[in-house]
């Protein structure tokens, strides 16, 4: 049975971030899934101490609230010279992407060690309060001294990937899919999710 012959299942993305939802729609386009955004009025409190814990909390909460499978991603930037900050607080470091970038560059002013890594934890949960899949990906790089590139979102313009010498914001969608932390995590999730969907469609 090919993926096109499988019954399409609703998968709710546990996020209100339009850029993140758009990225997941592209990553999941080849699977028999109806990808939807979470309800706008649904707020999930991220109380975990790790990316994996937060992804699990979000996936379980959104799956129960919607009665559908939910995919949650908790990702963030950890800077070595800042003892791993902003870490799980990456999205709450300031009020907007521009302000978050400004704050981080200011905190690294005069610091030579600009090593950093992005982490992405993915979790899929069912409406029956079951964690179906969990994976985590990582991308090594450094923080630039100024923003570079017009694509992407979040900290993308100031994170230069070790393997390419370019920032995420300078990459095409295909390049970012190959090198990003979320792309690495999805490469682990994809075969497991395909297998899960096949099992669900067996009579």
UniProtKB/Swiss-Prot annotation:
<protein>
    <recommendedName>
        <fullName>dITP/XTP pyrophosphatase</fullName>
        <ecNumber>3.6.1.66</ecNumber>
    </recommendedName>
</protein>
<keyword id="KW-0546">Nucleotide metabolism</keyword>
<feature type="binding site">
    <location>
        <position position="74"/>
    </location>
    <ligand>
        <name>Mg(2+)</name>
    </ligand>
</feature>
<dbReference type="InterPro" id="IPR029001">
    <property type="entry name" value="ITPase-like_fam"/>
</dbReference>
<feature type="binding site">
    <location>
        <position position="45"/>
    </location>
    <ligand>
        <name>Mg(2+)</name>
    </ligand>
</feature>
<dbReference type="InterPro" id="IPR020922">
    <property type="entry name" value="dITP/XTP_pyrophosphatase"/>
</dbReference>
<dbReference type="GO" id="GO:0009146">
    <property type="term" value="P:purine nucleoside triphosphate catabolic process"/>
</dbReference>
<feature type="binding site">
    <location>
        <begin position="181"/>
        <end position="182"/>
    </location>
    <ligand>
        <name>substrate</name>
    </ligand>
</feature>
<dbReference type="GO" id="GO:0005829">
    <property type="term" value="C:cytosol"/>
</dbReference>
<feature type="active site" description="Proton acceptor">
    <location>
        <position position="74"/>
    </location>
</feature>
<dbReference type="GO" id="GO:0036220">
    <property type="term" value="F:ITP diphosphatase activity"/>
</dbReference>
<comment type="function">
    <text>Pyrophosphatase that catalyzes the hydrolysis of nucleoside triphosphates to their monophosphate derivatives, with a high preference for the non-canonical purine nucleotides XTP (xanthosine triphosphate), dITP (deoxyinosine triphosphate) and ITP. Seems to function as a house-cleaning enzyme that removes non-canonical purine nucleotides from the nucleotide pool, thus preventing their incorporation into DNA/RNA and avoiding chromosomal lesions.</text>
</comment>
<dbReference type="GO" id="GO:0009117">
    <property type="term" value="P:nucleotide metabolic process"/>
</dbReference>
<dbReference type="Pfam" id="PF01725">
    <property type="entry name" value="Ham1p_like"/>
</dbReference>
<keyword id="KW-0460">Magnesium</keyword>
<keyword id="KW-0479">Metal-binding</keyword>
<dbReference type="GO" id="GO:0046872">
    <property type="term" value="F:metal ion binding"/>
</dbReference>
<dbReference type="GO" id="GO:0035870">
    <property type="term" value="F:dITP diphosphatase activity"/>
</dbReference>
<keyword id="KW-0547">Nucleotide-binding</keyword>
<comment type="subunit">
    <text>Homodimer.</text>
</comment>
<feature type="binding site">
    <location>
        <position position="176"/>
    </location>
    <ligand>
        <name>substrate</name>
    </ligand>
</feature>
<feature type="binding site">
    <location>
        <position position="75"/>
    </location>
    <ligand>
        <name>substrate</name>
    </ligand>
</feature>
<dbReference type="GO" id="GO:0017111">
    <property type="term" value="F:ribonucleoside triphosphate phosphatase activity"/>
</dbReference>
<feature type="binding site">
    <location>
        <begin position="153"/>
        <end position="156"/>
    </location>
    <ligand>
        <name>substrate</name>
    </ligand>
</feature>
<keyword id="KW-0378">Hydrolase</keyword>
<dbReference type="InterPro" id="IPR002637">
    <property type="entry name" value="RdgB/HAM1"/>
</dbReference>
<dbReference type="GO" id="GO:0000166">
    <property type="term" value="F:nucleotide binding"/>
</dbReference>
<dbReference type="GO" id="GO:0036222">
    <property type="term" value="F:XTP diphosphatase activity"/>
</dbReference>
<feature type="binding site">
    <location>
        <begin position="15"/>
        <end position="20"/>
    </location>
    <ligand>
        <name>substrate</name>
    </ligand>
</feature>
<comment type="similarity">
    <text>Belongs to the HAM1 NTPase family.</text>
</comment>
